[in-house]
Structure formats: structure tokens, C-alpha cells
């Protein structure tokens, strides 16, 4: 979602890529990586929609996922969070690719690859991942030459993330504020990290002295726990008799989600409402798939209107709920799951 600001060749000011050029660009990338001893299909692979579009369509960039530990090994990088990315950028520069951008927040190095001459640049993204199989799954794209979908892979991914978000969330600290309103102070939820796997995470909204609730959340990385980093692990978590084909496109995932194979049918409404709100909040907003029933679109838009009105009211009356003093904190130390629902102890 957030990497939209740098898609389409924007990171290195590259031009659009013709589908007929994709294989040539991948071959050039292979020359760079094979010289380091990295093997296609084992250490790296192309992901995304490039090469899977109709002949007259273009791509903004070429996405290539590479095992981070292998890149670190072949470059002799240190253990610092940015070391391998900076080393990769320096290595590309030594090969003459001097137009590059290190984007550690997106786990990638984007660089300009000359095609016909030095000024004819296209963008290639080397994305460093923990697990290649997982990343090929999460960043796969339908084959548009075979009309496998009407939608981008991103539309499928947002649904996948919303399913996980609303099926696996619990409040670990509930806060009563000084006006007796009740809000979440700390939550635990599962999140999909496209380059890493499915994780259990925590975040809170407590201020520095834990006497107030603030607007921005704080991630509690000490609670990060890997749940699975295999496609089948995620599939089995969500579906009975699920297969990787269920995740091929938005349409196939939506069909599986609406079927009796989905393990959490009681969460369908809040997933679909949250899904619409997620697409609406994208910049720019993404068109809602026509498969989504209008009732959920209406409920999402009503929630959006209410949130906007509340924000305007609090601003006009100088009320900052996320900065209000805490009256009482209720902590849930443990929980069990019964019939696919959480019960607090």
C-alpha cells in the first residue's frame, strides 16, 4: 500500500516498460546476480505483473525478490539494519548503475537500468526478502494475458490483509478515559509482511508516562512472533481444504472467502466493511470491486462519514481524545480461542 508513492519508475525517474522488453531486462538482472553466484529460482525470482500484461500494456518497474541472507553472504555485509542495502547500492554503482535509491523501509534498492542508450532508463527493484517462496506468493500477480483477473494483485492483497487483520485481533489493554469513554490502549493482531511472513504483533497508544492515550501508535517489536512463512501455512489458517489457487486473484480469493470453506464466517461483515475502507483510504482511492455487495460499501461509507464528523467536532471543540487522561486500565493477560472466538481470562 505505502510503496505506491515510489512505483512506476518514480524512484529513479525511469520510463514505462514495454512487455516485449521484460525478458531482456530480466536477463540483464540475471547477469548482475549470477555474477554474485545467485541462482534464479533458488536465490531470486521475478514477481509482480511485468511480463503478465497484454502486449499493448506497460509496466512501471520490474520487481525482483532476492533472498536477503544470500545477498548479505555474497556481499560480506555486516549485521547493521542498513548494511546489506547500502552494500548492494555500492555494488550496483561499481557496475555503472549510478542512478539508484536505497529504500530500507521498503526492503529494496531501486536502480535505473539503461536499455537502448545511457539516457533510456527503466526502473528495476531488487527487493531483499527473508523467504523467497513466501514473497513470490504474496507478491504474485494474475496473468492478464489469460484474463485471470479484472484487478491488480494489490486489490487481492488488501483483501488478504483485511481477512487476517479482522480474524486475529484482540485487545490486551482496554482504557477508560477521564470522560468515561472506553478505547483500546493496546492490541495484539496478526499482520502479513510481504517480504517476511505472517506475524503476531502488538502496538499501543499510551503516552510517554502511560497517563494518557495519544494519537499515534507505538509498535512493540519485542512481542513480534512468526506464525508462518509458507503459503500453505497461511492458507490452512484461513480455509478448510484451501489451495494456493484460491489466492491466484481477487476473484478466486473472494470466492473462497464467501464459501463454507472459510473458517471465520462470523467475521465476514467487518472484514468487508474494513476492506472497503482500506481501498477508500488508499492514495489515490482504489475502485471497489463490483463483487462486493452494496450493503457493505454503504456501511463502510457511513463509518467514514461518522469518523470525519467526529474529527471535525473534536477539532472545533478542541477535544483531542487520543490525548485525554487515563482514568483506568484493564489488562487481559491471557486468552483462549473457542469456536473461532476469543474468550478473555
Language-model features, listed with the residues they occupy:
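Metal-dependent nucleotidyltransferase catalytic core
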Residues: 12-32, 66-120
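Acidic-residue sensor for enzyme active/binding pockets
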Residues: 2, 7, 21, 309, ...
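Helical scaffold of the NTase/Pol beta-like nucleotidyltransferase catalytic core
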Residues: 1-47
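Structural alpha-beta junctions
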Residues: 38-40, 93-100, 165-174
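Short acidic, low-complexity intrinsically disordered linear motifs used
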Residues: 319-343
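Active-site nucleotide-donor binding segment shared across nucleotidyl transfer reactions
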Residues: 29-77
